[in-house]
């Protein structure tokens, strides 16, 4: 074959192979498009107290009618609205419906929403939020685990009649009414609150909304728009408007009950509720081990088009719809057993729907197998936008229970239908629906919108699950933990109660599998508890008894230290149970046995198991090696379960164990030290000394023994816990003296005197036997209680271990150093019994391991649970069986116990303002404080307490809480609902009450009430202002003084008063803004200046407005907002923008020098030149950002400064930023628009005066305007994003050219809605989206400085 022929053959082979691959890919795509979608989770709430799909099924199966009268909380005055005679204007002849029991209830704090925003929110949004959280939990998915993933949100939401006219909205709800009552926000709020990044779509096709949403979600899953879809619908009737409107049409059933497909049908009947599904591709659900409740085989939507009328149903369209859905499912009509009908109970709609079903599903059916037809609306009314998904949940439950429930209120089938035209039967009685070999059970669900949009889906029973392998028993021989957590203590109590009821009721539950589900499918929150038991009954009992639970609260997890005590922890049989129940413990003990055996003539295991031939723990040369082995083996157990030390600390002989765990000694060397040293003690010191523990400080102890020369201080264990050692007779003498003086003293049961001069007699012997040790460099930080410092070199030689035995143990000072200077918050005593835990200071968390006579798996699991309850990250997988979160055999666990408060704006009558309640009251600040130089002074503790009380009152008032007690003192205010609006309102209130000039960002700089109170108290102390408890008159005046934001501007308080401010206002009104800037620049020369960064009189610490440390760990860039030059500027400029970066990136804002308060509380110094100011900022930024790459962002004049700062960082500090974001800058040479709009600019400054424009700030603005007016020396090499406003600030003549922001250097452009000011206020999310997209691009392509 010629070469050319060979090439041709090769080419043909390659082409055939490529074609085959293309065909395979085409088949894969086709299979993907046709793949059924799995329903893996469901949640719902309906009338009659229905809170779950199980409740719904129980009600439906029992044939319950859930219609009731209008709840009083709605405030409708139904007696005035009701008129039994139809057609009278403004009245309704119906007073019944299937109302939600708690439509006003909502756990706002759980979602970080303030009470005043919750009050402004449509209850439909609130219901969707809680149901969406629950659907993840019910699917066995931790809701926190989906944050940042491509979960799509598709929800149906119709009526939006909750909010009143925004002009008469309740006080304090301004800024929340629009978003709180926009149907578009309903889906977006779910995505925002849960961090979901797939599509977020709200559908309003009236009654078909949620089923249309389901159809769109199925398409999104098949197209790859999302990997998981949350689908739902909601309906809450906030006003009687729907009753009045449909009463005028006489379209409603007078008794409020749906009589679907019945001769007695007399109109629709309203219901309320929320229904949510969670869907995945079937293959994904199986791969992830998620339980499949049912599958959606097919769906279709269409429109009636130009039919009999806008709101009239259209039979041919419904028939076409059903055929479309069956085709999508690749099924025939006879493959479907039942249809959940739309069935609204109207005399027009029901016959049309029934005829469409007869013409489609009613044809071609086998004898005796009619299509069954029912409607959930007969139980729960017409739940409008929620009704479609509600019907899906009903049919999924019917599939699971094998029963088709009956439809209520059907006297007989409607005579408006020829039922003989096909094989369709109404479910007037319940019918069994068992599984059948060779035939899958299927159901159709219909929903038709009043505007003509129709939807139909086909459901199929879940595919058979392969037999699961038997669940392996947990490592602890049946002992399992059930962890529970909540956002608040009250919610935790409720959660515990729910789980206890679950353990009581669900006798089929496997405790180990339920434990795994609790771990895998529930978010770990701050308030925690754990029940430990070896059976369902034991766990139930533990949950019922407070003393049976481990409880804790997570604050700052801080750092973890392992503590290894000296003697005194031993007890006969310690560790014996764990030898049999903990493989990790047994393996570590076996290693120790091997290491000890060359130096001892007894067996470690025999001693632990108390074998008759084994020596007892009474001998020092036995107890010390055994205690060592137990401690290091327990350390291995802690590490196996995910708790690893960031430092180790040992007490006396405990330092040997600590050294081994730290890697500073090998196991062989550690065994040598502990055995040979204890043998020397037994041979030479035993019987010659004693030790005593005193409840005294070190200094008081020293004074006590100064005349007892045979005694010395052996150890300092705590502030009032000191150990003395020495001669036995003097020990007795000291004990008697202490007893006589009422001082607690305990003689330690040892007969030798460690840490005293007695030890000097064995110095030479220890030098000999411990010669040749090979100390290592510690791999885990080792803090020496002998040296009082870190051991960082291989220094633990024989001499060290002599000194360790001879000299004082500085345990308490060591703990203080680790806690105060090194950030250690958790100290785990790794021992068979705790002896040091109770000596730890209150500011740290002390945890034990085993306890005397309680050393088995139950105690170990309890100790591990205590660690988790107090905030440590436990590896639950090491404690629990390896199984999926929820297998088909596992009953559903209780969902989160939301803590509801009532939020409801009642409808107003003619000419009235709406009433509103947040738990039925106006939140006010009830009490005040007297401030100022004339007040009766409190001591420091009293002042801090008084200030904290004031902070709590004002925070409660701003958030519209019932009382200050609802505001957690140690939780960040952002997490309980503070945002940019409430932060400013709160700051204004506190400033007015105290006379201070706190910045609007103060709640972000000092995020918790405690931290904030400390800042305020310190500032008052600096000013020498006293604080006193308020008089009755002062208590009455505080709320008036703390008027809400907007009632009085910052300028009106006097804080912004001054000659220049008044002149500036006049200049703006006269359209002489630019001229006055020159005046301010000239006058600024008379303000004191600083000429080097070191001389800057302000703290320029950047304020963390959003994000967290996770981003830095990932190497993603930190965003730094460069505050602008405006006199009202500061880090608060970025409050609204930064909200969109929460959970995305760290967002810092750095102040500009010259605008704040100097260190002596006077006016800050101005920089002598721009580079000096930039250097001061650069130092602050580099300190705050650490090793993380930095992206600078500025708006307007701040944008110009951001570029100058980038150049300065690059050239003067060798730290070029990863990028620069310039938001609407107008640099020199391109300032014509600024000159034309100078008046609008000035007016904008006064309109946005969150920070009062004092004379000092105006002069600073003038100084920086002069700095930026001239040419600058260079340009930064960092990539630049230019974000431009899309709307002019004022009138603009086209012949002037382009008014938009300009930048001469290379850059990327993003245009966003709004003008120069509103882009950073009303359209801040659009700016954030542009910035985030650009950052992702530059980090993906260029690495963004990683």
Swiss-Prot record:
Gene3D superfamilies registered for this protein in UniProt: 3.30.70.3290, 3.40.47.10, ACP-like, alpha/beta hydrolase, Malonyl-Coenzyme A Acyl Carrier Protein, domain 2
Sequence segments annotated as region (Disordered): 1028-1050
Cofactor binding annotation: Binds 1 phosphopantetheine covalently.
Keywords: Acyltransferase, Antibiotic biosynthesis, Coiled coil, Multifunctional enzyme, NADP, Phosphopantetheine, Phosphoprotein, Transferase
Active site location: 207 (for beta-ketoacyl synthase activity), 342 (for beta-ketoacyl synthase activity), 382 (for beta-ketoacyl synthase activity), 652 (acyl-ester intermediate), 1196 (nucleophile), 1316 (proton acceptor)
Positions of the UniProt region annotated as Module 6: 37-1332
Domain Carrier: 945-1020
MF term (GO), any: acyltransferase activity, transferring groups other than amino-acyl groups
Keyword DNA repair among record annotations: no
Activity across pH: Optimum pH is between 8 and 8.4. In the thioesterase domain, the size of the substrate channel increases with increasing pH.
Annotated consequence of substituting residue 1224 to A: Retains significant albeit reduced thioesterase activity
Annotated consequence of substituting residue 1239 to N: 3-fold decrease fo the catalytic efficiency and 3-fold increase of affinity
Skewed-composition ranges (Basic and acidic residues): 1030-1041
Limits of the Ketosynthase family 3 (KS3) domain: 34-461
Stretches of the chain forming a coiled coil according to its record: 3-32
Positions carrying O-(pantetheine 4'-phosphoryl)serine: 980
Catalytic reaction(s) noted: 5 (S)-methylmalonyl-CoA + malonyl-CoA + 5 NADPH + 11 H(+) = 10-deoxymethynolide + 6 CO2 + 5 NADP(+) + 6 CoA + 2 H2O; 6 (S)-methylmalonyl-CoA + malonyl-CoA + 5 NADPH + 12 H(+) = narbonolide + 7 CO2 + 5 NADP(+) + 7 CoA + 2 H2O
Pathway assigned to this chain's UniProt record: Antibiotic biosynthesis
Residue numbers spanned by region Thioesterase: 1127-1332
Top-level taxon of origin: Bacteria
Assembly description: Homodimer. Pikromycin PKS consists of a combination of multimodular (PikAI and PikAII) and monomodular (PikAIII and PikAIV) polypeptides each coding for a functional synthase subunit which participates in 1 (monomodular) or 2 (multimodular) of the six FAS-like elongation steps required for formation of the polyketide. Module 1, 2, 3, 4, 5, and 6 participating in biosynthesis steps 1, 2, 3, 4, 5, and 6, respectively.
Note: Type I modular polyketide synthases (PKSs) catalyze the step-wise condensation of simple carboxylic acid derivatives. Organizationally, type I PKSs are arranged into modules, wherein each module is comprised of a set of catalytic activities that is responsible for a single elongation of the polyketide chain and the appropriate reductive processing of the beta-keto functionality. A minimal elongation module contains an acyl transferase (AT) domain, an acyl-carrier protein (ACP) domain, and a ketosynthase (KS) domain.
Function: Involved in the biosynthesis of 12- and 14-membered ring macrolactone antibiotics such as methymycin and neomethymycin, and pikromycin and narbomycin, respectively. Component of the pikromycin PKS which catalyzes the biosynthesis of both precursors 10-deoxymethynolide (12-membered ring macrolactone) and narbonolide (14-membered ring macrolactone).
Protein name stated in the entry: Pikromycin polyketide synthase component PikAIV
Species name: Streptomyces venezuelae
Source organism phylogeny: Bacteria, Bacillati, Actinomycetota, Actinomycetes, Kitasatosporales
Underlying gene: pikAIV
């Amino acid at each position: 074959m010629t070469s050319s022929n060979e090439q041709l053959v090769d080419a043909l082979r390659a082409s055939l192979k490529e074609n085959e691959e293309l065909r395979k890919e085409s088949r894969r795509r086709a299979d993907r498009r046709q793949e059924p979608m799995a329903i893996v989770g469901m949640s719902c709430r309906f009338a009659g107290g229905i809170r779950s799909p199980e409740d719904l099924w129980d009600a439906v199966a029992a044939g319950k009618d859930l219609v009731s009268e209008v709840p009083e909380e709605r405030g409708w005055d139904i007696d005035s609205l009701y008129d039994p005679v139809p057609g009278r204007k403004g009245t309704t002849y119906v007073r019944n419906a299937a109302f939600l029991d708690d439509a006003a209830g909502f756990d706002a704090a759980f979602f970080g929403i303030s009470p005043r925003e919750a009050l402004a929110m449509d209850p439909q949004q609130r219901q969707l939020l809680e149901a969406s959280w629950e659907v993840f939990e019910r699917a066995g998915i931790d809701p926190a685990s989906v944050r940042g993933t491509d979960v799509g949100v598709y929800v149906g939401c119709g009526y939006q009649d909750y909010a009143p006219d925004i002009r008469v909205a309740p006080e304090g709800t301004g800024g929340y009414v629009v978003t709180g009552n926009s149907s578009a926000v309903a889906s977006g709020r779910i995505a925002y609150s849960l961090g979901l990044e797939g599509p977020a779509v709200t559908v309003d096709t009236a009654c078909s909304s949620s089923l249309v949403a389901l159809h769109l979600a199925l398409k999104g899953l098949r197209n790859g728009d999302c990997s998981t879809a949350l689908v739902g619908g909601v309906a809450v009737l906030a006003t009687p408007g729907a009753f009045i409107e449909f009463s005028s049409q006489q379209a409603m059933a007078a008794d409020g009950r749906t009589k679907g497909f019945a001769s007695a049908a007399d109109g629709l009947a309203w219901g309320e509720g929320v229904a949510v599904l969670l869907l995945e591709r079937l293959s994904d659900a199986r791969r992830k081990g998620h339980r499949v409740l049912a599958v959606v085989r097919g769906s279709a939507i269409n429109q009636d088009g130009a039919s009999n009328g806008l709101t009239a149903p259209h039979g041919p369209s419904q028939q076409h719809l059903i055929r479309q859905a069956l085709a999508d499912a690749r099924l025939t009509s006879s493959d479907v057993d039942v249809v959940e009908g739309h069935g609204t109970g109207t005399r027009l709609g029901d016959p049309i729907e029934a005829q469409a079903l007869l013409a489609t599903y009613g044809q071609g059916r086998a004898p005796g197998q009619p299509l069954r037809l029912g409607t959930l609306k007969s139980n729960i009314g017409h739940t409008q936008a929620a009704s479609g998904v509600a019907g899906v949940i009903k049919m999924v439950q019917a599939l699971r229970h094998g029963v088709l429930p009956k439809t209520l209120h059907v006297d007989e089938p409607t005579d408006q239908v020829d039922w003989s035209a096909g094989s369709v039967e109404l479910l007037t009685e319940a019918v069994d629906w068992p599984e059948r070999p060779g035939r899958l059970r299927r159901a159709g669900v219909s929903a038709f919108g009043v505007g003509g949009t129709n939807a139909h889906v086909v459901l199929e029973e879940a595919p058979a699950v392969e037999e699961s392998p038997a669940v392996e028993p947990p490592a602890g021989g049946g002992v399992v933990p059930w962890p529970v957590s909540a956002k608040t203590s009250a919610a935790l109590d409720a959660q515990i109660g729910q789980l206890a009821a679950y353990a009581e009721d669900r006798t089929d539950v496997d405790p180990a599998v339920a434990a795994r589900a609790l771990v895998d499918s529930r978010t770990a929150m701050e308030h925690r508890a754990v029940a430990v038991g070896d059976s369902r009954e034991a766990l139930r009992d533990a949950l019922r008894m407070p003393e049976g639970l481990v409880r804790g609260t997570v604050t700052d997890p801080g750092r973890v230290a392992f503590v290894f005590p000296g003697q005194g922890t031993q007890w006969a049989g310690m560790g014996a149970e764990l030898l049999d129940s903990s493989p990790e413990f047994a393996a570590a003990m076996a290693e120790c046995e091997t290491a000890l055996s060359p130096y001892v003539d007894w067996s470690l295991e025999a001693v632990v198991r108390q074998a008759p031939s084994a020596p007892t723990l009474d001998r020092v040369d036995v107890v010390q090696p055994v205690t060592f082995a137990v401690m290091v083996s327990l350390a291995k157990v802690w590490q196996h379960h995910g708790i690893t030390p960031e430092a180790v600390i040992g007490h006396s002989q405990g330092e040997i164990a600590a050294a081994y765990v730290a890697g500073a000694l090998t196991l062989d060397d550690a065994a040598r030290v502990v055995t040979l040293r204890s043998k020397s003690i037994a041979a030479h010191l035993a019987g010659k000394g004693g030790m005593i523990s005193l409840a005294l400080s070190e200094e008081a102890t020293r004074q006590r023994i100064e005349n007892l020369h045979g005694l010395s201080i052996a150890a300092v264990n705590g502030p009032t816990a000191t150990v003395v050692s020495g001669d036995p007779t003097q020990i007795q003498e000291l004990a008697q003296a202490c007893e006589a003086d009422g001082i607690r003293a305990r003689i330690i049961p040892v007969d030798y005197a460690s840490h005293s001069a007695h030890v000097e007699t064995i110095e030479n012997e220890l030098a000999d036997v411990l010669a040749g040790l090979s100390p290592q460099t510690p791999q885990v930080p080792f803090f020496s209680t002998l040296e009082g410092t870190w051991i960082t070199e291989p220094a633990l030689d024989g001499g060290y271990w002599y000194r360790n035995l001879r000299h004082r143990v500085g345990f308490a000072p060591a703990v203080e150093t680790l806690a105060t200077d090194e950030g250690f918050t958790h100290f785990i005593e790794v021992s068979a019994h705790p002896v040091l835990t109770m000596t730890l200071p209150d500011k740290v968390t002390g945890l034990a391991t085993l306890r005397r006579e309680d050393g088995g798996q139950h105690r170990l699991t309890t100790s591990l649970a205590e660690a988790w309850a107090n905030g440590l990250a436990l590896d639950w997988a090491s404690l629990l069986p390896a199984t999926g979160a929820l297998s088909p055999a596992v009953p559903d666990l209780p969902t989160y116990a939301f803590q509801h408060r009532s939020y409801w704006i009642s409808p107003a009558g003619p000419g009235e303002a709406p009433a509103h309640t947040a738990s039925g009251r106006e939140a006010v600040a009830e009490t005040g404080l007297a401030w100022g130089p004339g007040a009766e002074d409190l001591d420091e503790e009293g002042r801090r307490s008084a200030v904290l009380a004031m902070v709590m009152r004002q925070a409660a008032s701003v958030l519209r809480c019932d009382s200050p007690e609802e505001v957690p003192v140690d939780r960040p205010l952002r997490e309980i609902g503070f945002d940019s609006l409430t932060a400013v309102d709160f700051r204004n209130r506190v400033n007015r009450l105290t006379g201070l000039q706190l910045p609007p960002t103060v709640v972000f700089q000092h995020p918790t009430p405690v931290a904030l109170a400390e800042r305020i108290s310190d500032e008052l102390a600096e000013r020498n202002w006293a604080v006193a408890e308020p008089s009755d008159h002062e208590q009455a005046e505080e709320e008036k003084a703390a008027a809400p934001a907007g009632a009085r501007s910052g300028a009106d308080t006097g804080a912004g008063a001054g000659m220049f401010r008044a002149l500036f206002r006049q200049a703006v009104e006269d359209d002489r803004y630019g001229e006055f800037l020159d005046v301010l620049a000239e006058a600024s020369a008379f303000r004191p200046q600083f000429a080097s960064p070191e001389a800057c009189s302000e703290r320029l610490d950047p304020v963390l407005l959003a994000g967290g440390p996770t981003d830095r760990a990932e190497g993603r860039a930190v965003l730094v907002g460069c505050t602008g030059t405006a006199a009202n500027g500061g880090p608060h400029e970025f409050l609204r923008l930064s909200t969109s970066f929460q959970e995305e990136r760290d967002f810092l804002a750095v102040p500009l020098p010259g605008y704040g308060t100097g260190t002596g509380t006077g006016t800050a110094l101005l920089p002598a030149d721009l580079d000096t100011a930039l250097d001061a900022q650069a130092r602050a930024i580099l300190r705050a950002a650490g090793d993380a790459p930095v992206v600078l962002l500025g708006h307007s004049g701040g944008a110009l400064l951001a570029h100058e700062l980038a150049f300065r960082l690059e050239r003067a500090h060798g730290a070029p930023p990863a990028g620069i974001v310039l938001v609407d800058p107008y640099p020199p040479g391109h300032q014509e628009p600024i000159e034309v709009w100078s008046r609008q600019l000035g007016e904008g400054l006064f309109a946005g005066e969150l920070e009062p424009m004092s004379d000092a700030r105006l002069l600073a603005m003038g100084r920086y305007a002069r700095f930026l007016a001239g040419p600058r020396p260079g340009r930064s090499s960092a990539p630049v994003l230019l974000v431009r406003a899309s709307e002019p600030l004022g009138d603009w003549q086209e012949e002037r050219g382009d008014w938009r922001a300009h930048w001469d250097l290379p850059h990327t452009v993003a245009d966003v809605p709004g003008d120069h000011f509103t882009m950073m206020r009303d359209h801040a999310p659009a700016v954030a989206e542009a910035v985030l997209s650009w950052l992702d691009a530059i980090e993906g392509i260029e690495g963004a400085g990683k």
